[in-house]
Amino acid sequence: MPEELSKKQTTRLNKLQKRLRREVGSAIADYNMIEDGDRVMCCLSGGKDSYAMLDILLNLQQRAPVQFEIIAVNLDQKQPGFPEDVLPAYLDSLNVPYHILEKDTYSIVKEKIPEGKTTCSLCSRLRRGTLYGFAQRIGATKIALGHHRDDIIETLFLNMFFGGKMKAMPPKLLSDDGANVVIRPLAYCREKDLEEYAELKKFPIIPCNLCGSQENLKRQAVKDMLNQWNRQFPGRIETIFTAMQNTAPSQGVDREQFDFVSLKRDPDAPMKGDVAEANLPAFDFLDIANSGHIDLDAAKRIDIVNVYEV
């Protein structure tokens, strides 16, 4: 039997639960992740994030203004040492409908990936394909994954540094074939909060390194960089995520996102200065007649004292 929490731990758990519930609720509302009548397939890996996601979604299910189903699904990829009884026992205790799928992707990965190389990428693709197909079989209208805010930010920098793309993990995604909608209810949640929540809730965590593969070194390098920034500049990670939600294509350089080629000056636009010059008289700098000069009152005149050439 798990040890009972102290009064201090119980208080902390309640605060964390409220925060995570609020953040998940906000993400669901902001991106219209869950709608009335949805059948949500909640993908469980046995890690802290997916446990927390299921726990919070079950909690919100009792309070949400819409009705939706939750079906938990785990894919047993036949990794050596995988404890097959852990998830069924946990899900039975919650009285949650669930499916355990069995597919030996481990052997496929070991056959295709050279010894010593990271297998996570191929393993993830094989897992995703199986889960997408099963979602259609059971009539799931949404597939919920346990990626959190840190995952999203890390993916942005991974793609920037190593892929040359401004691309992250969207909170809501339509699969390429249009058959599945993927949602990430933990998109606003911090990893450290989820770690603490999982520890206090005493989820039966299954390690993700049973296959023997080391975590992607590039992702770990990005994670270390972000952690260092967070220590050195508190609040920077929050600012990065806010920036990701406030993009301005017209202020970038991506011609696919904004039509720079067709930009033309409007010759009929009213003659006025820039916003920074709102109090100055308006004139046309391109008008040859005034040669770019205008007479100002002495009080408004700026004298140039010295000009230095570099």
Swiss-Prot record:
Listed CDD domains: TtcA-like
Keyword set, alphabetical order: 4Fe-4S, ATP-binding, Cytoplasm, Iron, Iron-sulfur, Magnesium, Metal-binding, Nucleotide-binding, RNA-binding, Transferase, tRNA processing, tRNA-binding
Organism: Shewanella oneidensis (strain ATCC 700550 / JCM 31522 / CIP 106686 / LMG 19005 / NCIMB 14063 / MR-1)
GO BP terms in the entry: tRNA thio-modification
Family annotation (Pfam families): ATP_bind_3
Record-listed [4Fe-4S] cluster binding positions: 120, 123, 211
Ranges in coiled-coil conformation: none
Gene3D superfamilies reported in the protein's UniProt record: HUPs
Matches recorded under HAMAP family: TtcA (MF_01850)
Other facts noted in the record for this chain: The thiolation reaction likely consists of two steps: a first activation step by ATP to form an adenylated intermediate of the target base of tRNA, and a second nucleophilic substitution step of the sulfur (S) atom supplied by the hydrosulfide attached to the Fe-S cluster.
Subunit and interaction comment: Homodimer.
Record GO cellular component, one term: cytosol
One function term, GO molecular function aspect: tRNA binding
Known pathway: tRNA modification
Record family assignment: Belongs to the TtcA family.
Compartments reported by the entry: Cytoplasm
EC number(s) per entry: 2.8.1.-
Enzyme class label: transferase
Protein name listed in UniProt: tRNA-cytidine(32) 2-sulfurtransferase
Functional note: Catalyzes the ATP-dependent 2-thiolation of cytidine in position 32 of tRNA, to form 2-thiocytidine (s(2)C32). The sulfur atoms are provided by the cysteine/cysteine desulfurase (IscS) system.
Essential cofactor(s): Mg(2+); [4Fe-4S] cluster
Catalytic function, reaction form: cytidine(32) in tRNA + S-sulfanyl-L-cysteinyl-[cysteine desulfurase] + AH2 + ATP = 2-thiocytidine(32) in tRNA + L-cysteinyl-[cysteine desulfurase] + A + AMP + diphosphate + H(+)
Span of the annotated motif PP-loop motif: 45-50
Cofactor binding mode and count: Binds 1 [4Fe-4S] cluster per subunit. The cluster is chelated by three Cys residues, the fourth Fe has a free coordination site that may bind a sulfur atom transferred from the persulfide of IscS.
